[in-house]
Every structure is written in structure tokens, then in C-alpha cells.
Amino acid sequence: MYGLFDERVAQVRAQLAAVLKAPADGGREVYERDLAAARLAGEIRRYEAAESGMVFGRTDAADGTALHIGRLGLHAEELELPLLVDWRAEAARPFYEATAVDPMGLRRRRHLRLEGRTVGAVNDEILDGSEATADDVVGDSPLTEVLQARRTGRMGTAVATLQAEQHAIVRSPHRGVTVVQGGPGTGKTVVALHRAAYALYAFPRAAERGVLVLGPNARFLDYVSQVLPSLGENDVVLATCEELAGVVPTVTEPAESARIKGSSELADALAEVVRQRQAVRGEFAVQGVRLGEREVGRARDAAVGTGLGHNRARQVFKEYLVDLVTDALERDALETLERIDAEVAEATGLDLDRAAAADLRKLGFEEAAGSSAADEFDAEAVREGLLEDPQVERAVEELWPTLTAEAVVRALFASGVSQLGPWSDADVPLLDEAASLVDGPPARTYGHVVVDEAQELTAMQWRMVVRRCPARSMTLVGDFAQAGPATTARDWGEALTPHVGARFELHTLTVSYRTTVEILATTRDLLTRIAPGQKPSSAIRRGEVPRTLTVTPDGSTAALLAELQDQHAQHPGELLGVICADTRTEELHAAGVTRWAHLIPASQARGLEFDGVVVLDPEGIEAARVSGERDLYVGLTRATKRLCTIAVRQRSSEST
């Protein structure tokens, strides 16, 4: 199998070398050569990414047919069956979905773990009820091994251990909007990223136009950044809303004004700001020609009717006015020439046109049919001159000024609703909305969009997403129990209906693979408060009972450092996280907390996971933001093994 793999890689490398050496004469040939080189280089990257753990499974059918399952497909022309089946292919479906109740024609599902190119471990599941034979290796579930493994600070693929409810969503044929609701640890992010890889494989539009993965923050995107490349997919863009808009916010918006700026009413308000700068009233006067409000209104309607962004529509407006002025100048020129002819004829008794024609005939020239004084007016030259005339440009600018997105947003808040200082995170979708009004749709759109932590998006951020996915092919994953302070929607229907109507499929993940029974039990009352109608996830693992320390305010930092040092000594090599109110991160960083653990502000903890988590001052986290209870819920569910909370109260230290 690896022999064929090496052969294919060598072939692609040779093709790339030949393309790069090929001469290219002219821009078109250079473009085509570069395009071919980029395609081949991407193919090489896909092969390289798939080499590690290339094969991870095998299915043995009851009729004896065996298929190996891996990160990519390999086919030899002389063989009827593929050497390796891509995990996204239909033939791989039984590997993920077969059960003892419905074995889907399989006798055995085999999990393989490679060390380099050598099989390091084998585990078999007998699915048809038959007895295990000497060829079967039955042990702990590969999922159990993965769940018990230490965290690394980066998410890995779950391509070998996707569970049936997850896999069904990943492979859903629905090309519209797929929504995945699930509590902490249910694998929402895993589903989202593997869904992106599947979309590239199965949906031609996604493969042609690419996939966008939108995450809540840069920390989260760094955490998941290696998943898709390790699945062999490089045609995926990972971004935050800020990166999509090309804006770097430098201040944090207060919660209440963030909710206002996130509301859909702001879209109409921004559109009105632009509309008021599109020749709502006024006349246009250049070169002695005056166009009244009626003519200007016709020009405005023609420009607006194109559906172009304000600045491109401005050129249509300008050209329409210039055409009207050119027509007026031509009429004036004709009237002037006719008046001169009439005055000369009256004074001399001569018809100048007839006299000129007679003279031309005497000289041997033929009279041009239909010639007149109007033929001497070069309308196209006049039109071009007007388009380049600074006076015309100034007159157009007064009626239909060139705009920037920044100017539109600042004009919206000129009444004092918001400070006009540096941009905040809540300003980003407003700037993007304004950019679409001013310059038209974004330059880059995608065939499929995946949004993680989608419950975080405001109405204005949803508009950002939809603009970049004209086909409305999206996978959205989240949990409204973890929603932040700017979110006003209470459920998926409320969030999505304005953009896609009822055209979305809702799936619910019910099993928590990351969080233990004991940890989920500590969050049950909190979940009831923040999401009364939401059913708790069911954990499949048991672990340590969470501990609580109670300390005085003056002793909280020292207690935290002592706890981290103790955990570090008892569990060397494991990944520790400290989650605290955002306002305390600077102080704790200065105290040296990052020597022992990752320091995470509560507002940034969504989507992350650690072996052990220490939540510092739960009451402080609750009080820090409007969504404080939800932030605390997120923080308490980040651990895969151990949870410790340090409560800060006036009483002396206790431990439970």
C-alpha cells in the first residue's frame, strides 16, 4: 500500500517539476502554468498530510470482502477493489455506523494504530454475534483510549473514532444549513471540522469555491488549526469575524451597547445613512447646462436600480448625468447653428448649406447624404471630456459623494449614541455591513461555511456570514446554554429565520465524550438556571470527584499557585488550564501562573479543553459580565479529567 502511495507522490512531484520548467510565453500561459503548479503543490501537501496515520481501519464483510479505511483513497488499475478507501467515501460508511444491532453486512470492524508505517496496535469489534477467533484482537475501545489520552493544546482528528451520531451529521447529504446543537464535550467542533472535509469531498460547489471555518477567536482557531490539514484538506480558510472584515478592534464594547450594535435594526440604519447620500434632492449644473431635480432623480433611480454598491453605482449616476448634459449641449449647438444660418440668410439672402453644397459639387466632391450642422457635433468627444472634467466631478460629489465604510459607521453614530474613538469588536459587523453597502458584496465567497460556537453570533454577524455564502450551504454548531452577552437570539430558529427561513436541519448531540459524570453533575443546577428547557448531556466516563477550595481574597493567588504546583507534581505532562474573570488575567500572568498552566479569561474559554482545570473565583466570573453564569458554565466543563474550583470568600480556607 505504501509502495503505491510513494509511487503516486513521486508522479505528482515529477509533474510539478515539469510544469515549473516549462516555458511560458505571455500572460495567459504564465497564468495557466502557475495554476497547474498550485494544483499539483496542493496535491503533494494532501499526500504529505495523509501519510501520518494514513490507514486507521478495516472492515471485514460477512462474505469475506475486506476494505482498508484511511485518510485518502488509493486505487491500483489492476485491482478490482481499492487498496485504501477514503473515509468520506460511501464504501466507508459501515466502518462508522455499523453496530451489533445493525452490522450492515460486516462481521468485524478493525481499528489500526500506525507508528510510522508500521502497525502499532490493533483492536477488533465483532459485529455479527459470532465468536472471536484467533485472528481477532478484542480489547479496549479506541474511543476510550482517545478520551483517556493527555491533551496536547491542539485538537487532533477524530476520523478514526467518529461515533455514529457524529458521523451521520458529518455525512449528511443536506446541502443547505445543517445545525448541530450539543452540550459541552459532545464533539460539536469535531463534527464541524470533519463536516468541512466531507463537504470538500462530496459537494462540487464547496470544492470549487472552498470552505470557510469561522471561529470565535484566534485562540480557538489556533487550537483547531491542525485538524483539516491532517485530514489532507488545505483548501479551507480559518478566520474570525474580525479577520473576515479586515478590522483589528482595539477596545472592548460594553455589554449593553454591544447588544444594540448587534441588532438587525442597525442594518436598516446603515442603509439609510448611505441612501441619504445618493442625490436625494438637488440640481446639477455644469457647462451652462442645468438639470433639475426630475432629471437628477432619473439618474439616481438608474444608478440605484443596478443593485451595485454605492461607489460603483456613483459612476452609473455620473455617466447618466453626463449623457443628459451631452444631449443638452448637442441640442444647444444645433439650435445655435440653425439660428446663425437663419440670421445669415436674412441678412444676405443666401442659404449657406445649399451654397456650400453647390461649391463642393463644382469642385468635384459629392454631397454626403443627410449631412447637416448636427454632424459637426462630436458627442462622444464631448462626453469623454465631461467625464474627465473636474467641475463635473465636483458637482457629482456634492450630490453623490464617494464613501468609505468607516465614514458611514461614524455618520450613523454622529448623534452621540457611541463614542467615535477606536473600533471595538461590536463595530466589526457594522463596518462589514457598511462595506457591502459602499463597495458591494465581498470579493471572496465560499461554497460551504462552517461556524463553530455559532450561538455567539449577533444578528449583524449572521449577515456577515450569509454574505459570504450565496448558496446558503452551511454547518453551524453551538450550544445556547453557552451563549455570550451580545447574543439576543434564544434559539436556532430565532437566529436563523431572518436569513434562511425554516430551511435548516437541526441535529442534537446527546452524549458527552469529554466531560465526566462527576463534572457534569456539578453543573446541573447551573444549567437549569441558564437554559431551563435544555436536557443535560449524558456522560459515558467516570472520573475524579471535583474539589472546591475556599479562600480569602488576599489568599486566592497563592492558593491557585499552590494548587497548580501540586497538580503539576502529581500529573506531570498533563495540560492544565486556569479559567478566571477577564479582569484578573493580567494580575495572574504577572504572578507567574503561566509557568504551570494556560491562563484563559472566561470569555475566551469556549471550545477549549484541558486534562485539568482550575476555576478561580466562580462568583467573580458570574459578576464580571452579563453572561457571567454562562461563562462559568463553560469554564466548569473544560476539563477531561480533573476540576478544582477556588471560591473566594471572607471566611478562612477550607477544602471539600
Where do the PLM segments sit?
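P-loop NTPase Walker
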Residues: 1, 5-8, 12, 16-27, ...
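Extended, charged low-complexity regulatory segments
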Residues: 1-168, 653-656
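A general structural signal for short secondary-structure junctions and capping/turn motifs
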Residues: 46-51, 58-61, 102-104, 111-113, ...
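Alpha-helical nucleic-acid-binding subdomain
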Residues: 66, 75, 200-449, 456-464, ...
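Phosphate/oxyanion-binding active-site loops and adjacent basic polyanion-contact surfaces
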Residues: 154, 158, 188-192, 317, ...
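Conserved acidic
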Residues: 154, 313, 515
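Amphipathic, well-packed alpha-helical segments that form the structural scaffold of globular domains
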Residues: 163, 167, 171-174, 197, ...
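Conserved helicase motor core of SF1/SF2 NTP-dependent helicases
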Residues: 206-209, 218-261, 433-448, 455-656
